Amino acid sequence: MAILGLGTDIVEIARIEAVISRSGERLARRVLSDNEWAIWESHQQPVRFLAKRFAVKEAAAKAFGTGIRNGLAFNQFEVFNDELGKPRLRLWGEALTLAEKLGVAHMHVTLADERHYACATVILES
């Protein structure tokens, strides 16, 4: 296995909160997949939930080397937790097509947050 990409992102949670205060749920609609949206709607800390998802998706886009453009969208990267609570990534649409084209066989996700920040790293392996 070879490392195909590595991406890291850090998000200031207060910035996400400010955007939600100004524009309502538009950011969440743009960033979250349908499954994530269902969780966000009833989450006890929706701003923190969104900030963490945003960080993972930005890190993933960086790992792919593309950023969010050329057909890639935030909601094509879905963050979920396995049975032990470990964050994982599921890809849809153009993100899945790109992963297949690059030969991505494994995606590793780490996610951390504290009072003011959420941070994520994504590693893509062949």
From Swiss-Prot:
User: In the UniProt record, does the keyword Lipid metabolism occur?
Assistant: yes
The cofactors named for this UniProt entry are: Mg(2+)
Q: Where does Mg(2+) bind?
A: 9, 58
- The broad enzyme category this protein falls into is transferase
| Cellular component annotations (GO), alphabetically ordered | cytoplasm
Q: Which family does it belong to?
A: Belongs to the P-Pant transferase superfamily. AcpS family.
The protein's name: Holo-[acyl-carrier-protein] synthase
Task: Give the originating organism.
Answer: Salmonella paratyphi C (strain RKS4594)
Could you tell me the gene encoding this protein?
Answer: acpS
